């Protein structure tokens, strides 16, 4: 009887460890829906096919990006931006998705290969269970050796419906949001300034095989028995300083054509310069309840912690 009881306890603990985070019930904070303040664009108007063109289907404001054995797929914005509001509604592949990476990010690596900036929301398929996790990261001036990752569990199932993934990048701060809830803020002040992205960037939406990178050196590679892995993309919002159109020189305040005070882009205006009290409370909720990794707490990784961690 004792052996059976101990076996049952072990089984129970193991079962608990496999429970997806989105199976838990969360009461989410009420926040302003920033995504309601910007217009949506047609995919073809805002993006070009970056890679895997045969795995990209576009129908108006909806796109489907597919990862299979032949290739992943990626879109890149037709314009480069120096600050802006960037958002898309994504629906992730259901089922076993170990090694699958869906990325919504800003980068200028193609323009500045040795000193590039990057702001990432990366959605990582998990091994041994069907839930996904959120990873955020920031690079500036080619500082790729200093990973500034922070990782979060979802509070919903991202495979069952569309959800908003948003980046706010301006001269004040960078904010990462999921369903309009801020999960991370990276300010442009103090010790953070040396690591703050400052050059014009393009927006990318991609799905790719990240087995070697995302699953402990390939321990849990993509299993193409479950392919194709399809990511649905909708309601894309691109609002900011388009460098290509000459509305920004890459320095100074973010302005629309005209250059007057009244032409300040709202993304660099007062409403977006700081987080509201409700947004700060919501971010605190997300970080307390759902964040499970921060580079600033990883002392084994860094003998000398990045300056902003101090």
Curated annotation (Swiss-Prot):
Expressed at low levels in vegetative tissues (roots, stems and seedlings). Predominantly expressed in green siliques. Expressed in flowers. The keyword Cell wall biogenesis/degradation applies. The record marks 120 as: Important for catalytic activity. Glycans are attached at residues 30, 59, 141, 245. SUPFAM superfamilies: Concanavalin A-like lectins/glucanases (SSF49899). It is an enzyme of class 2 (transferase). Residues 1-21 form the signal peptide. It comes from Arabidopsis thaliana (Mouse-ear cress). It is a single-pass membrane protein. One of its GO terms (cellular component) is plasma membrane. Pfam families: Glyco_hydro_16 (PF00722), XET_C (PF06955). Disulfide bonds join 296-309. The chain crosses the membrane at residues 90-106. This is Probable xyloglucan endotransglucosylase/hydrolase protein 33.
């Amino acid at each position: 009887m004792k052996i059976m009881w101990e076996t049952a306890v072990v089984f129970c603990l193991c079962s608990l460890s496999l429970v997806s985070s989105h199976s838990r019930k969360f009461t989410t904070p009420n926040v302003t829906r920033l995504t309601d303040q910007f217009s949506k664009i047609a995919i073809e108007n805002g993006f070009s096919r970056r890679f895997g063109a045969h795995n990209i289907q576009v129908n108006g404001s909806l796109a489907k990006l597919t990862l299979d054995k032949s290739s992943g797929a990626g879109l890149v914005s037709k314009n480069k931006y120096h600050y802006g509001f960037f958002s898309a509604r994504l629906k992730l592949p259901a089922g076993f998705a170990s090694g699958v990476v869906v990325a919504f990010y800003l980068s200028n690596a193609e323009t500045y290969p040795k000193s590039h900036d990057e702001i990432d929301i990366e959605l990582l398929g998990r091994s041994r269970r069907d839930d996904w996790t959120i990873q955020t990261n920031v690079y500036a001036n080619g500082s790729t050796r200093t990973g500034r990752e922070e990782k979060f569990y979802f509070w919903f199932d991202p495979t069952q419906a569309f959800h908003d993934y948003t980046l706010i990048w301006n001269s004040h701060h960078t904010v990462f949001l999921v369903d309009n809830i801020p999960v991370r803020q990276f300010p442009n002040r103090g010790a953070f300034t040396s690591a703050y992205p400052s050059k014009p960037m393009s927006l990318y939406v991609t799905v790719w095989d990240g087995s070697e990178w995302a699953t402990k050196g390939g321990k849990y590679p993509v299993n193409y028995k479950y392919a194709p892995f399809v990511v649905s993309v909708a309601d894309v919002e691109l609002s900011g300083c388009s460098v290509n159109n000459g509305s920004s020189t890459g320095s100074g305040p973010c302005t629309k054509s005209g250059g007057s005070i009244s032409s300040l882009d709202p993304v660099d205006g007062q409403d977006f310069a700081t987080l509201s009290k409700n947004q700060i409370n919501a971010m605190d909720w997300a970080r307390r309840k759902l964040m499970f990794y921060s580079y600033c707490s990883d002392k084994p990784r860094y003998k000398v912690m990045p300056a902003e961690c101090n």
